[in-house]
């Protein structure tokens, strides 16, 4: 039986979040055993925030949750790809559909931002 290897990165694994319908990479976040278990159990994506040092469910503040459709691991069992149905317009906390909106062009990073919501309104604290 294959077991996910959480040992290589201090108990964390990268999780690539991909749109189930079109294959677009929406975001990359980190999971530990508990958040992977919650994701598999609940069918919603859960992550571990290295910055805030806490667990969080995608969309818990914005409402832009993700329904888990399929989960895969790589040949080393130390990374997962989670294919989701994105609820709400955007996966990125910046309001963009994907976190990957900065592109290398002509020797520099160029932002192709098209926010679908205003983060200042959504993440009031």
Curated annotation (Swiss-Prot):
It catalyses: 1-(5-phospho-beta-D-ribosyl)-5'-AMP + H2O = 1-(5-phospho-beta-D-ribosyl)-5-[(5-phospho-beta-D-ribosylamino)methylideneamino]imidazole-4-carboxamide. It comes from the Bacteria. Zn(2+) binds at residues 75, 92, 99. GO terms for molecular function: magnesium ion binding; phosphoribosyl-AMP cyclohydrolase activity; zinc ion binding. Mg(2+) binds at residues 74, 76, 78. GO terms for biological process: L-histidine biosynthetic process. SUPFAM superfamilies: HisI-like. Transmembrane segments: none annotated. Its cofactor is Mg(2+); Zn(2+). Pfam families: PRA-CH (PF01502). GO terms for cellular component: cytoplasm. Its EC number is 3.5.4.19. Pathway: Amino-acid biosynthesis; L-histidine biosynthesis; L-histidine from 5-phospho-alpha-D-ribose 1-diphosphate: step 3/9. Keywords: Amino-acid biosynthesis, Cytoplasm, Histidine biosynthesis, Hydrolase, Magnesium, Metal-binding, Zinc. Binds 1 Mg(2+) ion per subunit. It is found in: Cytoplasm. Catalyzes the hydrolysis of the adenine ring of phosphoribosyl-AMP. Homodimer. Belongs to the PRA-CH family. This is Phosphoribosyl-AMP cyclohydrolase. The lineage of its organism: Bacteria, Pseudomonadati, Thermodesulfobacteriota, Desulfuromonadia, Geobacterales.
């Amino acid at each position: 039986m294959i077991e996910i290897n959480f040992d290589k990165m201090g108990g964390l694994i990268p999780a690539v979040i991909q749109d189930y319908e079109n294959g677009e990479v929406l975001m990359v976040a980190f999971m530990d055993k508990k958040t992977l278990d919650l994701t598999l159990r609940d069918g919603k994506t859960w992550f571990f925030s290295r910055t805030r040092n806490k667990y969080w469910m995608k969309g818990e503040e914005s409402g832009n949750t993700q329904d888990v459709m399929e989960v895969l691991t790589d040949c080393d069992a130390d990374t997962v790809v989670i294919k989701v149905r994105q609820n709400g317009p955007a996966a990125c906390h910046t309001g963009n559909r994907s976190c990957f909106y900065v592109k290398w062009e002509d020797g520099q990073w160029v932002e192709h931002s098209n926010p679908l919501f205003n983060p200042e309104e959504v993440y009031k604290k």
